[in-house]
Amino acid sequence: FGYLYKRAAIMVNRSDKKSRFAVYGFADKVIAKGYSICIFPEQDYVNESILLNPFKRGAFKMAITNQLPILPLVFYDCKRKFPWYTSYGYPGSLRVKALPKIEAEILKEEDLEKLMKATHQKVKKVLLEDEKKTALQAIDLWQKISSSA
C-alpha cells in the first residue's frame, strides 16, 4: 500500500509554505496529462467534534483555473473508522457517495467563495442525513472520551 500511495498521492507538508505551493505545480502537471485528481479540501482534520471543517480555497481555485468540473465525494465513515484517537477506530469498508458534478468551467475567480460555501453545504447536508449517523456517533464518542480524560 505504501508504495502505491507514494506513487499516486501528491504529498504536502501543510506547515511548509513552499511545500503547499509546490503542490499546485505538481497537480497542474498531472491534470495536463489528462489524469483526475482527488483533493480533500478540509482545513483541518484533528478536531473530532466538528462534523465537517471549513474548506480551503486551493481545490476550488484549481478547478476554476483549469476549467475542470468538481465531483464532490462524501465519505460517511472516516470519522468513526479513522479517528485521530486511534484506539477507537476499526478496519472495514467505507461508504462513499458521489454528489452531482459541479461545472466549474464556467466560473470565474470571483465565484470562488460561493462555490466553496455551496459545496461545503451540500456535503454537510448529506452527512447529516446519513441514516447510519456514523459521523455524528463519532463526534458523540469523542466528546465522551475527551470529557472523561
Give residue spans per PLM region.
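Catalytic core of membrane glycerolipid acyltransferases/transacylases, capturing the structured
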Residues: 1-18
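Non-catalytic C-terminal accessory region of glycerolipid acyltransferases
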Residues: 23-149
